[in-house]
Amino acid sequence: MGNDGISRIGYARSSDGFQIDERLTNPVFEPNQEIEKNGCEDPRLTLIDNELFMTYTALTERDHWQLYQIALTSIKASDFIAKNWNWKERVLPFRGIRNKDAVIFPRKINNKYVMLHRFDPDLCITYSDELRRWYDIRSVFGPRHNSWDAWKIGAAGTPIELNEGWLCIYHGVSYEKEYSLGVVMLDKDNPEKILSRSEKPILKPTKDYELYGKVPNVVFSCGNVQVDDKVLIYYGGADSVLCVASYELNELIPKK
């Protein structure tokens, strides 16, 4: 976010997943239409057949009322690697409806593309034949009373396919407005079916850079990478710094 208060999306590269080797000075993606004039934020990237699909939150304000919508675009993986920012058409799956925290599964399930997103207060699922028109919106799970995720929830990074099912990292917010991360395991063939869900968060704000900042008491993730038997979770600390946490896969699989 710049001094003008508008969110834009940048690019940074790491060879080992921890140290930043390169960070571009200018944005690689920024608002170019009315529905996102106040920002493009919370990008989530999914690679499908040599195409990188990016969901993000398109933000605008009308008469002091904030409208956030999920938006979708894509870029060829070869262009992304070459830093040719030839983004394709920007699509609003649910135009005019407040919605956010969207992420696409990395392959078709039952011949359909699948996306998680949040219609308040639940984390929902929806389907598409061609990544443009989405339908069959259904709730998968919602906040839990008197829990670390009691106020609201939302998807984090791209679901990870394991033999056991789809491992999905998500954020949950407590009544005290503390943002933490948890995990849920969804069935491989029917991702509307929950196999297990973590009772406690896997990551919560404890460090100074997570407790104090632009928005205090926040760990918020939009991306994760599986490297062999480890998962690197990239997250924002207090909406001010970029962080990474490393986990063994077996640490993340919630008990039934």
Label every model-predicted segment.
Residues 224-226:
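Electrostatic interaction modules used in gene-expression and signaling proteins
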Residues 41, 102, 157, 220-222:
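Structural signature of WD-repeat beta-propeller blades
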Residues 1-38, 47-151, 160-214, 228-256:
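Beta-rich carbohydrate-recognition and catalytic domains
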